[in-house]
From Swiss-Prot:
Catalytic activity: Release of an N-terminal octapeptide as second stage of processing of some proteins imported into the mitochondrion
Protein name as it appears in the record: Mitochondrial intermediate peptidase
Span of chain positions assigned to the transit peptide in the UniProt entry: 1-43
Cofactor needs: Zn(2+)
EC numbers: 3.4.24.59
Source organism per UniProt: Pleurotus djamor (Pink oyster mushroom)
Keyword Cell cycle among UniProt keywords: no
Entry GO CC: mitochondrial matrix
Keyword line: Hydrolase, Metal-binding, Metalloprotease, Mitochondrion, Protease, Transit peptide, Zinc
Upper taxonomic lineage: Eukaryota, Fungi, Dikarya, Basidiomycota, Agaricomycotina
Family to which this protein belongs: Belongs to the peptidase M3 family.
Function: Cleaves proteins, imported into the mitochondrion, to their mature size. While most mitochondrial precursor proteins are processed to the mature form in one step by mitochondrial processing peptidase (MPP), the sequential cleavage by MIP of an octapeptide after initial processing by MPP is a required step for a subgroup of nuclear-encoded precursor proteins destined for the matrix or the inner membrane.
Binding positions (Zn(2+)): H567, H571, H574
Length: 785
């Protein structure tokens, strides 16, 4: 797949919404790693006794919780030895040199592929060489993506941007190279070659084929040029749409009398004093702290109504911008012979078609609606009691937070303060119980990291040794992007059968080739128990936690931050365990509607007291400082889920054939959807769709998160819930799902994991079946009264 890495990199950079030196083989620790005996792996009863923390677990706590561990690396940061251990990246200009070298070597390999029809032997190597070509480019593009987002030095950021743009431009040229397409067509048309392919190789070939087809490669030159033009226009419109989606909406004008009786005695009292002093209406901006407080605490409906309407307003130009984006996508799909953008996008996803997505959403909506109606009835009774109205008044959108105020997420049981090091140690212990994999601190070489507070962790398999690396850039700093992200800087692939000698050579190009080869070869290692030599995965986890200090002590995480770490480490483990022979199907390089399953499933483990015991809660912290458990039922959880289903349905409508109708209106379509399927009334004059940025990043695939939540809930309840530390169950999940990355049909993985053969076809009935599974992920939802 030549397009997906670049596209993913671009989307990550646009979304506000997841890769070294050190020991290459497992070192013996001062005390043996704890062992799970054969008998304990085969426990029939539903409790596996947690194994005590290891030396490495204690080292994780010391590394991440002690302020002293942050001073010793500054020397390593200042002495330049090469970013990620690459001697080519000792200074920013090295990025430009590396990009140029990669271009030269990529062109040489491209020429080899174009000559492949000269011999049957070369045709058999086409898929391997296309994967090499993709990895050659993505290895630099993905690294540049991280650097331009996370590096604090502007010179490095600018160099990374230049390298990124240069290589993405070349990749776009390859995606429309008719010669490459014809060679791959010759390969897939030869039964003897196809029959000799393994499952991974065939999956990789199909990915390349679909990507070429999506690039209009088989169209006449004039239409191909139109495809390129439309694709560029979509990128421009998408950037503009995201900018407008994040533009502040106009303020609501609120009279002081409308704030009478505010339950908030802090900010609310100050607002009332301000209004009395100025003798003017208050101008409150949607999304501000004042607006959030009013939506939660204002007894009168009117100020909440005004703020809701202001928050969901749009200008005519903002609506037209979105509709231009939708129409342009529709034209692109029609150009390649697809009925709609959704049909084009979903052809290689688990859902396969918009019709199947609708089957899933309809089934999920039918299952969820009774629970949501019951929750709304509860809120209606609260409104009735508050306003002394006749029975069951209508709940309006602006009533939601007042009658069901949000709370921060909370653990299921009381816990002492969880430090960053303790949570990482708990993660390591969990991975060891499930997979025989643990995390171990590793030293950084001079110049290896981009900031002195970045730490490197080895990912160690009890049998195979080191299988990859995680760089943890965990602490907030000025200029660092907000939020959490998982960057795959280097994917796995087999390298001993690259056959580089047959690429050919050009004397003038030799210096460039050596630079590119040196960059690649530093990541190649043999793994115990696995045939061949492999490029091991390298991922970076970026967060913005507070830094430990002598005065304030170690970093203590809020519960939502613990959830974030578990989610992102689910992605990281997918990358580490999914070490395939082809980089295009390794780890998280899988279908959009499957990729979130491992990360969402990780959040479910936080609902288990057995798993929480791995945080080693036997501390001397006074119970008054403990995080309080969330014991109450959330009446609004089902309303949240129903609202998400409506958003996914809206996404499908906006990418359906109806968008090409001259009379199409995104606002009218949203209103019609609410009237036919909604439970809370649509408010005339509102147009939330212009703020829904996921319409660009996840166009026609917004259902994916709901879909993976449903599957993760099923996997948790049927596989792990009763015994979440059981090694046999972890091995089954690892064997049936994680190890394949994207190299196997996800439906086959899920059907085998759940022992449900009827799911394997992934047809409309399978989509309906998943839609009927209860989404049991309250652990990932804010608690509410």
């Amino acid at each position: 797949m030549l397009t997906r890495p670049a596209q993913n990199a671009l989307l990550k950079s646009m979304q506000p919404l997841f890769r070294f030196r050190g020991c290459l083989l497992a070192k013996s620790t001062s005390t043996p790693r704890r062992d799970i005996s054969t008998s304990s792996r085969k426990l029939a009863h539903p409790t596996t006794v947690p194994i005590p923390p290891s030396v490495d677990d204690h080292a994780l706590v010391a590394l991440l919780d002690q302020p002293s561990s942050f001073g010793i690396v500054s020397r390593l940061f200042q002495t330049q030895g090469g970013l990620f251990g690459h001697k080519e990246l000792q200074q920013p200009s090295g990025f430009i040199t590396l990009a140029e070298a990669t271009l030269v070597r990529a062109q040489i390999l491209t020429n080899r592929i174009l000559r492949a029809r000269e011999s049957q032997d070369e045709l058999r190597k086409v898929v391997k060489n296309l994967d090499r070509l993709s990895d050659m480019l993505c290895g630099v593009i993905d690294l540049a993506e991280l650097v331009r987002n996370a590096h604090p030095d502007r010179a490095w950021v600018e160099a990374a941007n230049q390298a990124y743009e240069t290589l993405c431009e070349f990749m776009n040229v390859l995606n429309t190279d008719v010669g490459l397409y014809d060679v791959l067509k010759a390969v897939l048309s030869d039964p003897t070659i196809v029959q000799g392919m393994g499952p991974e190789e065939y999956s990789t070939a199909q990915i390349f084929w679909h990507d070429f087809e999506k690039s209009a490669i088989n169209l006449p030159p004039e239409q191909r040029q139109r495809f390129v033009s439309l694709s560029s226009e979509i990128l421009v419109l998408g950037r503009e749409f995201l900018q407008e989606a994040n533009t502040a909406r106009p303020p609501a004008s609120i009279h002081a009398s409308e704030l009478a009786g505010l339950k908030d005695k802090g900010m609310g009292a100050r607002l009332q004093l301000q209004a009395q002093f100025t003798q003017k209406d208050l101008l409150v901006y949607p999304g501000s702290l004042q607006a959030q407080m009013i939506m939660r605490c204002a007894p009168a409906e009117e100020p909440r109504r005004k703020l809701y309407i202001a928050a969901n307003s749009s200008t005519p130009s903002q609506i037209e911008l979105l509709e231009r984006l939708l129409r342009t996508r529709a034209e692109l799909a029609r150009l390649v012979g697809k009925e709609s953008f959704a049909h084009m996008t979903l052809s290689d996803k688990m859902a396969k078609s918009p019709e199947n997505v609708q089957y899933f959403l309809d089934a999920l909506m039918d299952y969820t609606r009774p629970y949501a109606r019951k929750a709304l009835r509860t809120l209606s009774m609260r409104k009735q009691a508050h306003l002394q109205t006749p029975p069951f008044p209508t709940i309006q959108p602006w009533d939601r937070d007042f009658y069901c105020p949000p709370e921060p997420p909370a653990p299921p049981i009381p816990l002492p303060p969880l430090t960053l090091g303790t949570v990482f140690a708990g993660l390591s212990r969990l991975f060891y119980h499930l997979y025989g994999i643990s995390l171990r601190p590793a030293e950084c070489a001079p110049g290896e990291v981009w900031h002195p507070h970045v730490h490197k962790l080895e990912v160690v398999d009890e049998d195979a040794g080191v299988i990859g690396w995680i760089y943890a850039d965990l602490f907030a700093r000025r200029g660092k992007p907000s939020g959490a992200a998982h960057y795959t800087v280097r994917c796995s692939r087999r390298t001993d059968d690259d056959d580089e000698a047959e690429d050919g050579s050009i004397p003038a190009a030799e210096p460039y080739v050596r630079v590119s080869q040196s960059f690649e070869s530093s990541k190649r290692h043999r793994v115990r128990g696995q045939d061949g030599e492999f490029q091991l995965p390298l991922v970076v986890l970026v967060c913005e936690f507070a830094r430990p200090s002598v005065s304030s002590g170690p970093t203590v995480l809020d519960w939502h931050e613990v959830m974030t770490l578990f989610h992102e480490m689910g992605h990281a483990m997918h990358s580490m365990i999914g070490r395939t022979e082809y980089q295009n199907v390794s780890g998280t390089r899988c279908a959009t509607d499957f990729v979130e399953l491992p990360s969402i499933l990780m959040e479910h483990f936080l609902s288990s007291p057995t798993v929480l015991s791995l945080f080693d809660v036997s501390s001397s912290t006074p119970s008054s400082a403990w995080q309080v458990g969330n014991h109450h039922q959330d009446p609004c959880h089902s309303i949240d889920t129903h609202s998400q289903i409506l958003l996914a349905a809206m996404d499908q409508i906006y990418h359906s054939p109806s968008v090409v109708d001259p009379s199409f209106s995104s606002t009218s379509a949203l209103e019609a959807l609410h009237k036919s399927r909604g439970l809370i009334p649509y408010v005339p004059g509102t147009s939330f769709q212009t703020q829904f940025g996921h319409l660009f990043g996840y166009g026609a695939t917004y259902y994916s998160y709901l879909f993976d939540r449903a599957i993760a809930s099923r996997v948790w309840s049927q596989v792990f819930h009763a015994n979440p530390l059981n090694r046999e169950l972890g091995d089954k999940y690892k064997r049936e799902v994680l190890k394949f990355g994207g190299g196997r049909d996800p439906w086959k993985m899920i059907s085998h994991l759940l022992d449900s053969p009827w799911l394997e076809n992934g047809n409309a009935d399978a989509m309906k079946e998943v839609g009927q599974w209860r989404i049991e992920d309250e652990v990932g939802q804010p608690g509410r009264h």
